[in-house]
Amino acid sequence: PGATARYGSYLSPGVIMMPSYVNIGAWVGPGTMVDTWATVGSCAQIGANVHLAGGVGIGGVLEPANAVPVVIEDGAFIGSRCMVVEGARVGKGSVLGAGTILNPSIPVIDAETGEEISRGYVPDYCVAVGASRKREFNGGEFYLPCVLVIRRMSEGERHDKVALNNILRDHGVAT
C-alpha cells in the first residue's frame, strides 16, 4: 500500500515494495526489497535479491541518450539514506553502510592499503562506508567525500547477518 511503480518500469516476480517509488524505465530484479521511502530513478538497474533500505535514493537518467544508469548488482544491501547516483555501480553482494554517497567522481578507497580502488564503483562482496579525506587547496585544507572499503568478504560471509553486523559495529557504523 502506498507504493508507486510508474508505467514503463519493470518489477520482476517477488519484488517487495513498501511505500516507495520506482520510476519509468527502471528494472528491479526478483526477490528485491524496495523499503519505505526508497526511490529508484529512471532507467536504474537493480539486481536480484537486493535490499534498498529505508530512504535510499537511487538516481535516474533519461537523457542524454548516452548517460550511464545506476547499477546495483545481485545480492547487494544499500543501507538507510544512501544516495547512489548516475553512473555509479555497486558490485554483487556488496554492502553500503547507512548514509553513504556514491557517484562516479567519488573515490573508493581500500582501508587496508589506502589505495584508490576505483571511482564510483564498489567491487563485489565489499563492505563500504561513507568517509572523507583531507585535501589541500589554496584556500586551506578541506575534507572531501570518499567511500571506504572496510572489509572484503567471501560470498557466503555476505549472508551471515550476525557477522555483517559485527563488521559494521567494529568500525563504528550504524546498522
Indicate residue ranges for each PLM-predicted region.
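Terminal amphipathic alpha-helical/low-complexity segments used for targeting or macromolecular assembly
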Residues: 1, 124-125, 130-175
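Structural signal for interior beta-strand "rungs" in well-ordered beta-sheet cores
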Residues: 1-136
